[in-house]
Amino acid sequence: AQVTEDLVQSSVVSSTGVTDFGNTVASDDNRASFDCSSGTNIIFELTNLSQTPTSIVSAQIRHEAQAQTIQSAVVSMEMLNSSNTQINTQNTTFSTTSDFSQNLTVHTTNDLTSAAFTADDINTLRVKITYITETGTVTTALIDHIFVRVIYNIADPVAGLIKLTSGKIKLNSGLIGIKN
């Protein structure tokens, strides 16, 4: 079975020029402020996968942000390992006067190892955002939501006891046996 999961910020490792970053865990118009000036950056850790993968299909940074102006701020977004070594990087923009969603490159391999991501790679993944430049004047960009979308495979369930405390079970085919 394949699972798609969005990993959000769990803790900030370091930050310069960024405030209220805890506001970025949901798309809810509560925003972090990102100062558009030299030296502004943030490194943050992500939540862990909720299930144990048999393999990782892909990882992709996605964000909703704005520049509060018709101008644009250019930032780099990097995936880092737990030692802050860069796995990959891509420039993106914070632009327009309302939240704008952007999906960055889908990565199927860890550029450090040239192999597929492992569960440990993903569970220790960090993201770094760094201010690069701007077109016009952008004083402060706002980040509403940022996450890493991970698609992974999990083992199919094996035969055994299913315990359901509430809800419904839908069976498209097969038999159900009930024992006391």
Predicted regions mapped to residue ranges:
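Viral virion structural and adsorption modules
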Residues: V158-N180
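Disulfide-rich extracellular domains of secreted proteins
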Residues: A1-P157
